[in-house]
Amino acid sequence: MQPAGRKLAFVLASSDHGTMIVNRLDYRMVDAERGYGVGFQILQTAAFDVAEVKLMVDLLTLRRKHFGDGVVAIDCGANIGVHTIEWAKAMTGWGSVLAIEAQERIYYALAGNIAINNCFNAVAVHGAVSSESGILPIPNPNHSVSSSFGSLELRQRNGNEFIGQPIDYQNTVNVRKLTLDEFSLPRVDLIKLDIEGMELEAIEGASRTIAASRPIMPVEKAKIDAAQLRRALEARGYEVIEAGINVLAVHTSDGTLAEIRPEPQLAAQQAPAMA
């Protein structure tokens, strides 16, 4: 074998979530001591956002309590699958997960993590969730350069977040653009939207699904117009609970709402950053 001198980015880590494929370079340092990124947090603490993961599992358990077995959760912006894995393990025998990730290299890690953790009730899809079907050119970052890859915005705008490396929006790869309505799922209990500025488009593309199933929706608002997000959710009959850089939207007809309402203060204190 002729050594190629390659930098190794993706590694296996024995984490509290199970054996996980992580990018050891998935970080952006804020200063000499502090950084962020899914891989960074797992390698530093053996887990990613434990409080938020527990909250999501608790929400799924509540939906089972009120609506019975067959719970379905959609993880949009699944990254390497921390939420997907934890949800799938928790729902063994009574629920399933659809995980969607737009970045190809991260999608490979997501699919591998589903397989290596034997989550037979989870499915991974490579695509960008939007308001319409088609093809979306997205930037192609260097995964061997330290960056917070989960913070990558698929579209260029004024004020794109710096993730740790310059992003060339002319150097793109095509990815499938899809709507959640395309899946025609008969039941959906939770839709997590953490897709770096495309959350409003995803809601529009899930109009039929939302109207039919009235799922709980944790939505990141950091890179979109928060007032517009609130209006879009309230117009669909949702109560919007503030939770740091996210909102938790629960339909006013949902029997779980009365049990969820006491949680906003705790959720805001945690200020979760979904991934």
Question: Which role does the model predict for each range below?
Answer:
Residues A73-D75, V97-I100, L190-L193, M217-E220:
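Short catalytic-loop micro-motif centered on adjacent basic/acidic residues
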Residues V125-G127, Y238-N246:
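Conserved S-adenosyl-L-methionine
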Residues G95, A122-V123, V188:
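Short, conserved active-site loop motifs that form the nucleotide-linked donor/cofactor pocket
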Residues G37, Q41-V72, I135-P137, S151-S213, ...:
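Short internal loop-to-helix segment that lines adenine-nucleotide cofactor pockets
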Residues A111, A115-H143:
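Core alpha/beta nucleotide-donor-binding catalytic domains of modification enzymes
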Residues A78, G127-S131, L180, I195, ...:
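Hydrophobic pocket-lining residues within nucleotide cofactor-binding pockets
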Residues C119, R231-E242:
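A SAM-dependent methyltransferase catalytic signature shared across enzymes that methylate proteins
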Residues M1-Q103, Y108-N113, N117, I163-Q170, ...:
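S-adenosyl-L-methionine
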